[in-house]
Amino acid sequence: MLKGGIRAAFAACAVAFAFVMNADARELPRPETFTLRNGLQVVVITDRRAPVVTHMVWYRVGAADEPRGVSGIAHFFEHLMFKGTRQIAPGEFSRTVARNGGDDNAFTSWDYTAYYERIARDRLELVMQMEADRMRNLRFSDETFASERDVIAEERRQRIDNSPGAVLGERMRAMLWPHHPYGTPIIGWLHEINALDRETALEFYRTWYAPNNAILVVAGDVDAAELRPLVERHYGRLRPTRDLPERNWVQDPPSVGPMRVSHRDVKVRQPSMSRMYRAISYATDEGRQAHALDVAIDVLGGSETSRLYRALVEEQRIAVSAGASANTGGRGGGSVSVYATPVEGVSLERLEAAIDEVIAEFLGDGPTEAELARAKSSMSAAAIYSRDSQESLANIYGASLAQGESIDDVVNWPRDIEAVTREEALEMARQTLVLDSSVTGWLLPEDGQ
C-alpha cells in the first residue's frame, strides 16, 4: 500500500495531527519513550480501553532515499518483507497474524516505510518476535524476487498507467521537483522496476533495515514498564548498521517561471484542472510557518465554506467541485494543490481564470477573523470525528518522528494551530501561492473539450 504525503493515511500532517483536538484540548497525549543501546527508538502510547495493541515499525527510509536509476526499491520491500526468514516461511507472517485474530499491512512514502500489526494484547510478543526477526534476517530467492518484480510492474500498470489522473499527477510532480527525489513516483518508473535486481535489493535492505534506523511505536493496552523487557528481548539483540548513510537529498533550484502540462486520454469523461506549488513543511519551516500555511489553505479551499468552493461552485456556478489542500508532512518540503472540475460547457481556460481571481483576492485581503476561526474549528472537528483510535495516534507519532519532527512538535500541534494569526496565515499564503513555483495540469478527453 503506497502512502504519500501520511500523512499518509493521513499523510497530510495537519489533518493527522488534529486528531482528538476539541474546544478544550491544547495538546495531544504525550507518549512514553526510550531508546535501546542499538539505537532503536521506542514510543509507547498507553490506551487501556480495550485489550488490544497496535505494533508498528517505521523505517527512516523511503522512495526519496533510492539511488538514481533504481526507483521503486523502497516500495518493493512491502512485498519482499513477507517472503520469509529462516524462522518464518514465505507468506506465513500474515497467516500467523490472521490465525491469532489480528491484521497486518505495510505502506511506503517518500520519507519512510512502515509495517504494522493490530492484535490482542496477549499476542503482542508473538508479532514482536516476528517483526524483529525480519528486520535483519529476511531471505528471498532470485525466483521470488523476479516473481514479485512482475507483480509490482503489473500493480503500476493498473494503478498509474491505466489511470489518466494518476499519469497527470506523476508528470506534474516530476516537473515540480525535477531533481529532488520527491519528483520520482513511490512505486517507481516502469523501466526501472523491470531492471531491479536481487543484489541491489539486498544491499538496500542491509543498509536501511536496522534498529538504529527504526522507530517502534506500540499503542494500546500496555505501558513502557511492561513493554521494555519484551523490546529488549526481541529487538535488543539486533545489530545496528555501521556508518548509516546521511539522508542528503538533491535540492531543486528556484523555479524560473510557471510550468504547464496537459494529458489527454480516451478514458477521461470530465475535464479537470489542478495546480501544484512547492511549499515548506513541518520539518523544514521556522516557527509556526507550516501551521500558518495549513490554516491559510483550509480557508482557501479546505471545505464547502472555503473561498474557492463558494466562489466557483455556489456563486459563479462554473464548477462541480473546487478546493485546495496542503501536504506539509514531508521531511524534504511540502506542496499545496489547487483543483477544480468545470460544469458542462465551461472551458478549462475560463475555470482557471476564475481560480486565479479567487487566489489573487485571497492574497490581497487574506482570511477574515471569522474564516480563520472556522478553519481552526474545522481542522479540529474533522479529526475528532475521524479515527478516534489507537492506530491514529500510532500513525501520527510514527510518521511525524520518521519525517524529522519531535514528540513535542506533535504534542503541541493543537496549541500552535490555535495560535496562528491572520497575518501569519496571509504571509505564508503569499510566500507559497506563487505562479513561478507552480505546475498547472489539465486533464482532457482525447478529442479535447
Give residue ranges: language-model regions:
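Bacterial N-terminal signal peptides
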Residues: 9-20
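Active-site SXXK
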Residues: 71-85
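Non-catalytic beta-strand/loop surface segments
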Residues: 21-63, 89-123, 159-213, 237-283, ...
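Short pre-active-site segment immediately N-terminal to the catalytic Zn-binding motif
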Residues: 62-70
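Non-catalytic, conformational "gating/processing" segments within enzyme and secreted inhibitor domains
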Residues: 149, 202-234, 437
